[in-house]
Design a protein with these regions (language model features):
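Mid-to-C-terminal secondary-structure elements
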Residues: 34-35, 47-71, 80-175
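Short acidic, glycine/proline-rich loop/turn micro-motifs
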Residues: 38-41
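Acyl-group handling in specialized metabolite and lipid biosynthesis
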Residues: 1-5, 44-47, 73
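Membrane-proximal extracellular/periplasmic loop immediately following the first transmembrane helix
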Residues: 1-34, 149-155, 170
């Protein structure tokens, strides 16, 4: 209704924009889906959102407990950490501050809780649990097929004084 067009980017296209843009100060990505949570009462389906390491910072979102994600946690095999949504933490863990450091099973894999978002945090991709994106071979710019899989939501902050025309031209230059 506001005239804004929304579409996804492939992982290689996201990395190209992130690395080659001359107009964005910061570019972050997210994707999500339903995952099974075990170890907290009965098994249940929760909404899991994978985000790039600077996603929370770009949006000005802070943690009430613990921390957000570190850049190295986007590496293969190093992304088994989660940040919980504040409301989810209240409902499922009764607001227990001892949740930080606890291990949860999500989709059959162990994840360590490293933080809880502050009350009132409203990310554009609301979820119950947030985990880092895994930058691996699917993020390789050389993977042509990967460019056809446009599953990432992408957000960016343009530099001071950069208008929409310059951003558009920059994105066209990148491809």
């Amino acid at each position: 209704p506001d005239g804004t067009e929304y579409s996804g980017l492939s992982a290689p296209d996201f990395m190209s924009v992130r690395e080659e843009s001359r107009t964005f100060e910061q570019v972050e990505a997210y994707t999500g889906g339903v995952v099974t949570l075990l170890g907290v009462g009965e098994p249940k389906q929760v909404l899991g959102i994978r985000v790039s390491d600077g996603f929370f910072d770009l949006l000005g979102l802070r943690t009430a407990l613990g921390r957000g994600f570190l850049p190295e946690e986007n590496g293969p095999g190093r992304n088994r950490v989660v940040v919980l949504d504040h409301g989810f933490w209240q409902r499922e863990f009764g607001g227990d501050a001892g949740v930080v450091g606890r291990t949860l099973s999500l989709g059959g894999e162990p994840y360590t809780v490293v933080g809880v978002l502050e009350r009132g945090a409203r990310p554009p991709a609301p979820g119950d649990v947030y985990a880092p994106l895994e930058y691996d071979e699917t993020f390789s710019a050389a993977t042509a097929q990967g460019r056809r899989s446009e599953y990432l939501g992408v957000l960016g902050r343009a530099g001071q004084g950069v208008d929409a025309g310059r951003v558009r031209a920059d994105l066209e230059r990148i491809g």
